């Protein structure tokens, strides 16, 4: 029986799953939006949100806990210097999942997962000259 077993297996063994979510969490913190399948996005939310909650209180112990989970110093610095102060007044729910259709190759449902309150940079308008 499968009672009280939380989390999705995603057809991977445990070390592959841990490495995949470590990489996806790093990418999400670095770029603040990534595109992935819906089940992976829902599981990634369970990995990233506790890290952001940890980053709201800056201490050496919390930085070491975050480094133990992500293993990337640049990401830990961004978590504690940018994302922690950004979400200090929010009590959870730091990510948003936007479904965006299905993948062409295997018809898998695809979604964007993004951090809330991210700054969207406007592309500069290009001026075309007839030269």
Curated annotation (Swiss-Prot):
Per its UniProt record, what InterPro entries does this chain match?
Ribosomal_bL17, Ribosomal_bL17_CS, Ribosomal_bL17_sf
Kindly list the GO CC terms recorded for this protein.
cytosolic large ribosomal subunit
* GO MF, one example: structural constituent of ribosome
Q: State the Gene Ontology BP annotations.
A: translation
- Protein keywords: Ribonucleoprotein, Ribosomal protein
Any one Pfam family here would be Ribosomal_L17
Taxonomy, superkingdom = Bacteria
Q: How does it assemble?
A: Part of the 50S ribosomal subunit. Contacts protein L32.
| Record PANTHER family | LARGE RIBOSOMAL SUBUNIT PROTEIN BL17M, RIBOSOMAL PROTEIN L17
Family to which this protein belongs: Belongs to the bacterial ribosomal protein bL17 family.
Which named protein is this? Large ribosomal subunit protein bL17
- List the source organism: Hamiltonella defensa subsp. Acyrthosiphon pisum (strain 5AT)
Taxonomy of the source species: Bacteria, Pseudomonadati, Pseudomonadota, Gammaproteobacteria, Enterobacterales
Protein encoded by which gene: rplQ
